From Swiss-Prot:
GO terms for biological process: carbon fixation; photosynthesis; ribulose bisphosphate carboxylase complex assembly. Keywords: Bacterial microcompartment, Carbon dioxide fixation, Carboxysome, Chaperone, Cytoplasm, Photosynthesis. An RbcL-specific chaperone. The central cleft of the RbcX homodimer (RbcX2) binds the C-terminus of an RbcL monomer, stabilizing the C-terminus and probably preventing its reassociation with chaperonin GroEL-ES. At the same time the peripheral region of RbcX2 binds a second RbcL monomer, bridging the RbcL homodimers in the correct orientation. The RbcX2(2)-bound RbcL dimers then assemble into the RbcL8 core (RbcL8-(RbcX2)8). RbcS binding triggers the release of RbcX2. Homodimer. Interacts with the exposed C-terminal peptide of RbcL via its central cleft, contacts a second RbcL monomer via its peripheral polar surface. RbcX and Raf1 can bind simultaneously to RbcL. It comes from the Bacteria. Belongs to the RbcX family. GO terms for molecular function: protein folding chaperone. It holds the Pfam family RbcX. HAMAP family: RbcX (MF_00855). Residues 111-132 have a biased composition (Polar residues). This is RuBisCO chaperone RbcX. The lineage of its organism: Bacteria, Bacillati, Cyanobacteriota, Cyanophyceae, Nostocales.
Amino acid sequence: MNLKQIAKDTAKTLQSYLTYQALMTVLAQLGETNPPLALWLHTFSVGKVQDGEAYVKELFREQPDLALRIMTVREHIAEEVAEFLPEMVRSGIQQANMEQRRQHLERMTHLSLSNPSPESEQQTISDTDWDH
């Protein structure tokens, strides 16, 4: 397991996601102030935001002002969430893992109760014999 590569890949994915969030913010703003430009940006962006850096690079060729605006918003979002993100990721994964384990245990328990094995039926019969 190459932790350094995992960290780099995670950072790139997060960067692309923040680019997407910045795009959504800019689209909302433009929807109020310049609907034709919002429509152009939406049309331009369809299917292109998976790689945030390639998207910004291509947008620079078409509309440099919009590329700069998205980069500015993306940087602002990153600054706002960076402080909380590591702990939120850790605790989110811990809680999700605990919930998955709980659900798995409930399913296993439910299966055991609804389909008892012959040994457990024999054990139940033996247990009731002790009562007499």
